[in-house]
């Protein structure tokens, strides 16, 4: 393979990898509204507290869970597991 083609392929792979890493970390919070919500259930043991999103945020209605290591993740309040977790976790 030519060196320029190899370099171009490496750059392309790096760009795809960075995009994938970035999209996973952005599954959380953007200022005051959730852009995306979790697809899978978050174990209760990782959650410290929660806060509800304001009414000015677009659908779906969501909460932000503050996790043990200072991270935050959004979850849709339409999901049964989220409603159950809200009964067991204190607001922030």
Curated annotation (Swiss-Prot):
Q: What is this protein called?
A: C-C motif chemokine 1
Q: PANTHER family this protein is in? A: C-C MOTIF CHEMOKINE 1, SMALL INDUCIBLE CYTOKINE A
Disulfides per UniProt: 33-57, 34-74, 49-92
Q: Which family does it belong to?
A: Belongs to the intercrine beta (chemokine CC) family.
For this record, the Gene Ontology CC terms, alphabetical, are:
extracellular space
Q: Which domain of life is it from?
A: Eukaryota
Q: Which organism is it from?
A: Mus musculus
Q: Which GO terms describe its molecular function?
A: chemokine activity; cytokine activity
User: Where does the signal sequence lie?
Assistant: 1-23
Matching entries from Gene3D superfamilies are given as: 2.40.50.40
What are the alphabetically sorted keywords of the record?
Chemotaxis, Cytokine, Disulfide bond, Glycoprotein, Signal
User: Do the record's keywords include Glycoprotein?
Assistant: yes
Q: Which GO terms describe its biological process?
A: cellular response to interleukin-17; chemotaxis; immune response
Q: What does this protein do?
A: Cytokine that is chemotactic for neutrophils.
């Amino acid at each position: 393979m030519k060196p320029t083609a190899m370099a171009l392929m490496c750059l392309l792979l790096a760009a795809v990898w960075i995009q994938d890493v970035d999209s996973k970390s952005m599954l959380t919070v953007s200022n005051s509204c959730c852009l995306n919500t979790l697809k899978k259930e978050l174990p209760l043991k990782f959650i410290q507290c929660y806060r509800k999103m304001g009414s000015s945020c677009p659908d779906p209605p969501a909460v932000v869970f503050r996790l043990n290591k200072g991270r935050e993740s959004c979850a849709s309040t339409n999901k049964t597991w989220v409603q159950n977790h809200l009964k067991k976790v204190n607001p922030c």
